[in-house]
Amino acid sequence: MLFLPSSPWWGKQISLTGSKTVVLWALGGYGVSFTLLGLGSVLMATGAVTKAVGLGILIIARIVYGLTVSAMVPACQVWALQRAGDGNRMAALATISSGLSCGRLFGPLCAAAMLVIHPLAPVWMLMAAPALALVMLLRLPGTPPQPTPERKSVSLKRDFLPYLLCAMLLAAAMSMMQLGLSPALTRQFATDTTTISQQVAWLLGLSAIAALIAQFVVLRPQRLTPVALLLSAGVLMSSGLAIMLAEQLWLFYLGCAVLSFGAALATPAYQLLLNDKLADGAGAGWLACSHTLGYGLCALLVPLVSKTGVAIALIVMALFAAVLFSMVTVFIWRCCKSK
């Protein structure tokens, strides 16, 4: 929840101090956060501190994470946009999205491999990762704060809300789909939790691969306009979730891939459309805030939806969010067409 107030604030700092500076701050916060997390875990495991003290250290670690790491993705996106230039903005955003997808794909594999060494080895890896990133980033040229063009606003306006609503609905739909995988798979595997866990891992891996394909095949070559991407994303997301309602396992996998492919098209599309109206730093910050709102909305709805006892209830709710997303994209298309 700390992402909500901190993301827009960091967006303003990007415009004031430059994106590289903000990325370095975010990496520093990332390193401090996981150092505290590892320290608290070790102290509690060895009995050096009471559980209350150890829990306090872990809470402080998460607070540091929420207040600083919220700057990471927006700052990286703006940095990539500024270095790429106006003609390659979509490809720049696709590069950042590709990095995130690779992290989702290989992160769990790295963690599983590190567990062979020690139960806390994944935390050690997270402590070392920001130091390695800092070494690489310090050598890259930074970009000075960019003046905001007169046609762009520096503050949020009512006209920008459809783009933020798209971001919120996308995050909510994807979160509910991921949380709904295990309940939905009980239709095929009943209470076999081991098999269900394996299937969820395969589905999440497939989701990351589908997103990578979208980013390399569609986004990086810049084959479609942002509005066309947004409309395509709505259709693909709704279609994918509708396919996932089927009981056949192969259709469930197909639907997950179609959904993830469509979702990968959406984020660069609404970010580019918003950046045409709002300063890059402010736009990235508000979109990050909207994504967090989507995750929060999902967290609020999950207990209510789960009470229905229907195995695919969360998938149905995700489909509803995707349909709303599609309706908003049509509204954006009509607004752009009228201009």
Features from the language model and the residues they span:
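Central cavity-lining transmembrane alpha-helices of secondary-active solute carriers
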Residues: 1-12, 202-217
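C-terminal ends and interior cores of transmembrane alpha-helices
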Residues: 29-51, 236-247
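Hydrophobic core of transmembrane alpha-helices in multi-pass small-molecule transporters
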Residues: 48-71, 168, 251-265
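Cytoplasmic helix-loop-helix junction between adjacent transmembrane helices
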Residues: 61-100
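Intracellular juxtamembrane helix-capping segments at the cytosolic ends
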Residues: 71-84, 264-278
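Short amphipathic helix-loop junctions that connect adjacent transmembrane helices
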Residues: 179-199
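C-terminal transmembrane helical hairpin of 12-TM major facilitator-type secondary transporters
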Residues: 226-269
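A late C-terminal transmembrane helix in Major Facilitator Superfamily
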Residues: 280-310
